[in-house]
């Protein structure tokens, strides 16, 4: 099975954040969420790449970019990682762990218990490292 990513590129909304000295304004959307889910599913089911490997690779790429574009200029900055309940939350826990391993100050705010096995595993790994997870109050 092959996938075609549309050539039409759209400027990503993150580029409008205006963070000083970064290249997020150059970030472009290459595919939509539905296409990305299909690519992930294909990698897992047809190629045999475990979901945890995909999460780890995504987290490493994000962590490298964050370090290069923002944290290298302000290494003492607290990084707050907001994790949802799905696989993006799992990516967040993996990114938080990688940032902590690189000696950055990190805290995680999580929407609740993970709904997927891989996301839950990354949450457990984060907690086994002795790190805490903040759950926002329902009153917020």
Residue ranges with predicted function:
Residues 1-31, 71-140:
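Glycine-rich phosphate/dinucleotide-binding loop and adjoining beta-alpha-beta core of small-molecule
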Residues 32-38:
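Active-site-adjacent bridging/hinge elements
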Residues 36, 54-58, 88-91:
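Generic hydrophobic secondary-structure packing signal
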Residues 43-46:
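Intrinsically disordered, low-complexity polar regions and short flexible loop motifs
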Residues 41, 59-64, 97:
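Residues within alpha-helical segments
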Residues 49-63:
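A glycine-rich, Thr/Ser-enriched phosphate-binding loop motif common to dinucleotide/cofactor-binding enzymes
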Residues 63-71:
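Generic structural signal for well-ordered alpha-helical scaffold segments
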